[in-house]
Amino acid sequence: MSPVEITGADAVVTPPMRGRVPLPPPPPPPMRRSAPSPPPMSGRVPPPPPPPPMFDPKGAGRVICCLRPGQNKSSLKRFQCGKLTNAWEELQRHGEAQTAPEFDLSEIEALFSAAVQNQADKSGSRREAFEANPDKLQLISGADALVPLPPPPPPMPRRSPPPPPPRFDAFDHKGARMVCGFRCPVTKRSSLKPLHWVKITRALQGSLWDELQIQYGESQTAIELDVPEIETLFSVGAKPRPKPKPEKVPLIDLKRANNTIVNLKILKMPLPDMMAAVMAMDESVLDVDQIENLIQLCPTKEEMELLKNYTGDKATLGKSEQCLLELMKVPRFEAKLRVLSFKIPFGTKITKFRKMLNVVNSACEEVRSSQMLKEIMKIILFLGNTLNQGTARGSAVGFRLDSLLILSETRADNNKMTLMHYLCKVLASKAADLLDFHKDLQSLESTLEINLKSLAEEIHAITKGLEKLKQELTASETDGPVSQVFRKLLKDFISSAETQVATVSTLYSSARINADALAHYFGEDPNHYPFEKVSATLLSFIRLFKKAHQENVKQEDLEKKKAATEDVFGGPDHNIDSDTSLDDSEAKSPSRIRPPPSIPRPPSRPRYACCRIPAVNPPPRLVCGPYPLPRLVRVGSPSPPPPSMSGGAPPPPPPPPMLVASRTAPPPHLSHVRSIPFQTRLVMGTSPLPLLVREGAPPPTLPSMSGGAPPPPPPLPMLRYQ
């Protein structure tokens, strides 16, 4: 067909139509107030008419699924996706149908077949059909007549291939939904562990993901991965359902069962191993505490009858019942445990009993054979009769043992000494060797922890234990092979234990006799004054005797030091306290210096002598004046007037005192004062430190403070008398 040529102002050159549908002529121009004409459709199929409303204006009718004629309803599960009506514009523009990969429909039907729904779920199916296919719904009013959709438009004629696809965009132009730019093979998805990453839904321009889309587009090839290996490593297999545990059959009390389990945990050893150690009487595997726990595990007679009468499956019993059944395999297992509990500490107990009984025998022998203790008791008897002479307590032939402790409670008139101190003083002056009488009683100290009555009870318990062991030996003869080794070991142990118990029993009898004899030795009744009380009284007397002797020694040392001090100052009449007549606070002041006692020195060394000024009557006293040093003022005289604070210049302070040692003979009125070494007299001087002058040497010249001639000697100390 040749193109139509139109001349004039409205002439339009129309290109030749190759393979296109001829366009209709343009409509006339719209009239005023008339409806706008539809836009020209160039090369497109006219769109189908809009679907009728889903419901009629009155709200009547129902929604049904409308299918195209000749198309069967699918029996597969619905794919709930959002349908786009304006997508694939490029493909529709060029008129090519979309090519889809080939699918295995049988596999899809096997995987996604819909189950047959009951009548109650029909409404749900209709609702799902309405939500899934909104464009295949039509309003039905009145009769149940099916209103089909208009027929589809005719296919577009074929033409040249479409242009290359545009650059991938994570969203379409309208932002309706996310579009994946990677084409993945459609395979059966295995249940793998998900990778919890943060997904990017849109590739930003210039990013790595944008470059990958530009470079590869939909033809991106991934690295070859071993998919079976990934499925093996990261598969989420269905967790096997735990097999239901068989219900345990409780036969014993719940509290008893809990205690049994707790004791098993404390033992920390398999029960069969412990039972084997018990049958072998192995002391290295179990101790006494573990054996006691095992004894608590042993079943009682009622529990044994209950377990024996149980006819059900033994595996359904609880852990505590299983433990009791294991213990019941050995006949009289509790009795065998008690045998081992008796055997383990037996050797230690026998050794301890022998040691204690030997100590008792030694202590009794030492007390009865001590001659020094006998002499001390004789002196105490004589001293008591002296104090009680002429009274009802006098002329005693002896005294009770408790009276030894009263010596430290009887005090002298000055309350500085007790009768125990006097006894030690007499012994120290007349018989010093008796002060160490306690050295003859070395074993007495070890008897404090011994009680013969408790010892007798323990020995009796051991004897009873041996009788029970003999009974178990007789009963184990009928146990059979399970107790053969145990029976042989028990027989040997009983034979050895009987010999040791007999020895200890004989030793105890000897100790008992010696203890009673010791009480008789002091005139006491053994029933009222047992051995424990005798030993405790003697030990208390020894402790008080030592304490009194130590106090006497300290007092004697103090008296010697005091006597030496009085000898230095010429007797008690000329002590410092009486000479100065100071107050008590001044007399007790640490500033009062007492000269040390005389110390002999080699004759080659020079000796220094000084004289001491005796006290005058009335003695002077120290008073506090305005001077930096105290002054000696006679008692009763007024204190010197203080210097004027507002008048002329105050008098100069006196120079500090100087201690000078002089060998000159004392004046006639002081001839009775002895000269002793290291004694000084107080003189006034200008030197701040005392000077010691050697005998025969001239007195030293005082140092000059200004470099000129030395100052004249200072005056004597100021002593004023009334």
Curated annotation (Swiss-Prot):
Recorded GO molecular functions are: actin binding
**Chain spans, region Disordered:** 1-56, 564-606, 635-672, 690-722
Q: What is the superkingdom listed in this entry's lineage?
A: Eukaryota
Compositional bias per record (Pro residues), positions renumbered to this chain: 22-55, 593-605, 638-658, 709-722
Return any one Pfam family short name: FH2
Q: Which PROSITE patterns match?
A: FH2
- Identify the residues that the record assigns to the FH2 domain, covering every copy: 182-571
Record InterPro entries: FH2_Formin, FH2_Formin_sf, Formin_homology_domain
- Family statement: Belongs to the formin-like family. Class-II subfamily.
Name of the protein: Formin-like protein 16
Q: Whose protein is this, by species?
A: Arabidopsis thaliana
**What gene codes for this chain?**
FH16
